[in-house]
C-alpha cells in the first residue's frame, strides 16, 4: 500500500504520535530497535537507551524521540537529530503490528510536517548493511516512498 493509505490506516487504528523524553521511553524504543536489528541483521544499535537519554538531556533542542503509541504502548518510532538546516533520522523501528498498520509511516510523516517550514531537508541516513557494502533495497524503498532520493558515498581505503 502507498504511504498515504498507511498513514490514514494508522490514524484509524488509533495510533498517536508523541514526542517522548523520559529514560524509560528511550529504553523501550532502543529495545524495539535492537529487536528489529538483531532479527534482521544480527547487530545492535550503537547507542543504549541511557546514552540516548543522556544525549537528549545534553541537547534537548536537537535530539528527539517521536513515538507511535497504540493502546498506551510504544509500537514504532524514530529518533531524530536536529541541525541548523537538516533533520536526520538516526534510528527508525517498528514492531510487526506497527508495520501492518503504518505506525512508523505516521511518525515519519509527523516529523516531515513538523520541520518542513524550518529545515532544508530530511536526511534518512544510509541504506546499507554488512559494513556499508550492500544496499538494503527494502529500506531504500521505504525512504523513497516519502520522496527521498538516493546518493552514493564513495568509500576509499588508504594503506599508510
Describe each region flagged by the PLM.
Residues 119-160:
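Active-site/acyl-donor-binding loops of N-acyltransferases
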Residues 1-98, 115:
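A conserved beta-strand-loop-helix scaffold within acyl/acetyltransferase catalytic domains
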Residues 99-113:
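Conserved acetyl-CoA-binding loop-helix of GNAT-fold acetyltransferases
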Residues 94-102, 128-133:
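Short, contiguous acidic/charged loop-to-helix segments that flank catalytic cores in large enzymes
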Amino acid at each position: 500500500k502507498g504511504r498515504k493509505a498507511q498513514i490514514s490506516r494508522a490514524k484509524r487504528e488509533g495510533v498517536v504520535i508523541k514526542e517522548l523524553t523520559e529514560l524509560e521511553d528511550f529504553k523501550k524504543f532502543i529495545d524495539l530497535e535492537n529487536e528489529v536489528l538483531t532479527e534482521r541483521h544480527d547487530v545492535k544499535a550503537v547507542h543504549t537507551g541511557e546514552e540516548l537519554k543522556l544525549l537528549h538531556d545534553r541537547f534537548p533542542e536537537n535530539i528527539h524521540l517521536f513515538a507511535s503509541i497504540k493502546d498506551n504502548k510504544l509500537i514504532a518510532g524514530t529518533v531524530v537529530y536536529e541541525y541548523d538546516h537538516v533533520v536526520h533520522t538516526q534510528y527508525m523501528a517498528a514492531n510487526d503490528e506497527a508495520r501492518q498498520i503504518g505506525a512508523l509511516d505516521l511518525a515519519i510523516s509527523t516529523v516531515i510536517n513538523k520541520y518542513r517550514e524550518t529545515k532544508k531537508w530530511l536526511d534518512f541516513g544510509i541504506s546499507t548493511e554488512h559494513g556499508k557494502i550492500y544496499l538494503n533495497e527494502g529500506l531504500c524503498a521505504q525512504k523513497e516512498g516519502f520522496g527521498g532520493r538516493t546518493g552514493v558515498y564513495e568509500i576509499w581505503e588508504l594503506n599508510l
